[in-house]
Amino acid sequence: MTVVSGRDGFPSNLRLDGLTALVTGGGRGIGAATASALACAGAQVLVMSRTRSDLDQVVASVEASGGKASALVCDVTDSVRTRETIAALPRLDILINNAGINIPEAFVDVSLEHLDAIINLNVRAMFVVAQAAVRKMLEFPQRREVGGAVVNITSQMGHVGAARRTVYCMTKHAIEGLTKAMGVELAPQNIRVNSVAPTFLDTPFTVPFFKDPKFKDWVLQRIPLGRIGQLEEVTGAIVFLASPAASLITGTSLVIDGGWTAQ
């Protein structure tokens, strides 16, 4: 089998040259790593977060590696500001819908404040961002020919249940449903919509959790591959789903969980 390679050793159908990608929650963790990976594949990357200092570091890192990136300071829970920011973009081809939060606690202890906070970011903001991004994609006259891609970052918890994660699981299941429905509805416009559902990863988001030895042991016992995931094991999948290599894939979820949900 012959694999045709493009620049930087990427197979040509994994290249994103000439395309513009928006990454929400792009200041840290999965978002920051994804911004770098998309830029490496040739995309012009727009990195969105509410924290300017985080964005500046990501943009500087991308540019130091020869990529193209710009910062967009925006809190995605501000629906009006989010819509205005995305509507003002010259063009958009790819959305990585990544911002999210978790507050682990027992079901009977969940306060309305925590319930609203998680739903507002994990569901409402994800919907608003996706809607605004697709509206922008559809402004491009050649969208049907060029195609578009949305990748919603969910979780293995969007496929299973877990104690102390009832609200988080609920929101991630919701986005898995949104992904399927968007994939069906937007297929005629050649905008593909998929999700990536990782297991626990080694990120700043999870560091506080893994300081508890019992929790870390609980996680490792449930991953057949026996280890916590690394960011680069997820970003490659995201680039793939955003690229022409995944041109026949829509409305599905790529679960990257070391076997957690197979049991």
Question: Where are the regions that the model predicts?
Answer:
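Active-site helix of classical SDR
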Residues: 130, 171, 179
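Substrate-binding pocket helix/loop in short-chain dehydrogenase/reductase
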Residues: 106-107, 114-119, 219
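Residue(s) in the substrate-gating loop at a strand-loop-helix junction
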Residues: 155
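C-terminal substrate-recognition "lid" of short-chain dehydrogenase/reductases
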Residues: 191, 227-256, 261
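Conserved glycine-rich cofactor-binding loop
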Residues: 20, 27-28
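The beta1-alpha1 cofactor-binding region of Rossmann-like NAD(H)/NADP(H)-dependent oxidoreductases
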Residues: 52-53, 72-84, 112
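Alpha-helical segment proximal to the catalytic Tyr-Lys
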Residues: 135, 184-188, 247
